[in-house]
Protein backbone atom coordinates (compact mmCIF):
# COMPACT_ATOMS: atom_id res chain seq x y z
CA UNK A 1 0.00 0.00 0.00
CA UNK A 2 1.12 3.58 -0.61
CA UNK A 3 2.57 5.62 2.22
CA UNK A 4 2.73 9.31 3.08
CA UNK A 5 5.18 11.22 5.25
CA UNK A 6 3.59 13.54 7.80
CA UNK A 7 5.72 16.16 9.57
CA UNK A 8 4.58 18.34 12.46
CA UNK A 9 5.52 21.96 11.71
CA UNK A 10 3.59 23.83 14.44
CA UNK A 11 3.20 23.26 18.15
CA UNK A 12 0.11 21.58 19.60
CA UNK A 13 0.27 23.76 22.72
CA UNK A 14 -2.89 25.82 23.15
CA UNK A 15 -4.81 23.92 20.46
CA UNK A 16 -8.15 22.21 20.84
CA UNK A 17 -7.94 18.98 22.85
CA UNK A 18 -9.35 17.00 19.91
CA UNK A 19 -6.62 18.37 17.65
CA UNK A 20 -3.92 17.53 20.20
CA UNK A 21 -5.32 13.99 20.38
CA UNK A 22 -5.26 13.74 16.59
CA UNK A 23 -1.57 14.75 16.50
CA UNK A 24 -0.84 12.06 19.09
CA UNK A 25 -2.91 9.56 17.12
CA UNK A 26 -0.78 10.24 14.05
CA UNK A 27 2.29 9.35 16.12
CA UNK A 28 3.77 12.85 16.17
CA UNK A 29 5.59 13.95 19.32
CA UNK A 30 7.36 17.24 18.59
CA UNK A 31 7.96 19.89 15.93
CA UNK A 32 9.87 18.56 12.89
CA UNK A 33 9.07 14.97 13.87
CA UNK A 34 8.23 12.93 10.76
CA UNK A 35 6.31 9.66 10.59
CA UNK A 36 5.54 7.45 7.61
CA UNK A 37 1.93 6.25 7.56
CA UNK A 38 -0.22 4.20 5.22
CA UNK A 39 -2.31 6.32 2.86
CA UNK A 40 -5.79 5.34 4.05
CA UNK A 41 -9.00 7.37 4.26
CA UNK A 42 -8.76 7.34 8.07
CA UNK A 43 -5.24 8.79 8.06
CA UNK A 44 -6.21 11.34 5.40
CA UNK A 45 -9.13 12.47 7.57
CA UNK A 46 -6.84 12.92 10.58
CA UNK A 47 -4.36 14.90 8.48
CA UNK A 48 -7.15 17.12 7.12
CA UNK A 49 -8.33 17.83 10.66
CA UNK A 50 -4.93 19.24 11.68
CA UNK A 51 -3.75 20.46 8.26
CA UNK A 52 -2.59 23.77 9.73
CA UNK A 53 -0.06 21.99 11.99
CA UNK A 54 1.40 19.40 9.62
CA UNK A 55 3.11 19.06 6.25
CA UNK A 56 2.39 16.05 4.02
CA UNK A 57 4.71 14.53 1.40
CA UNK A 58 4.05 11.71 -0.98
Curated annotation (Swiss-Prot):
Keywords for the protein's UniProt record, in alphabetical order: Ribonucleoprotein, Ribosomal protein
Is Ribosomal protein one of the keywords?
yes
* Key word Nucleotide-binding present: no
Gene Ontology biological-process annotations = translation
Checking PROSITE patterns in the record gives: RIBOSOMAL_L30
Name a single GO cellular component.
cytosolic large ribosomal subunit
InterPro entries in the record, alphabetically?
Ribo_uL30_ferredoxin-like_sf, Ribosomal_uL30_bac-type, Ribosomal_uL30_CS, Ribosomal_uL30_ferredoxin-like
One Gene Ontology term of the molecular function aspect: structural constituent of ribosome
* Complex and partners: Part of the 50S ribosomal subunit.
Q: Which family does it belong to?
A: Belongs to the universal ribosomal protein uL30 family.
Protein name as catalogued = Large ribosomal subunit protein uL30
Report the source organism.
Answer: Psychromonas ingrahamii (strain DSM 17664 / CCUG 51855 / 37)
- Whichever gene encodes this chain, its name is rpmD
Amino acid sequence: MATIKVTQVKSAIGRLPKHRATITGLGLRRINHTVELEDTPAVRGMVNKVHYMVKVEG
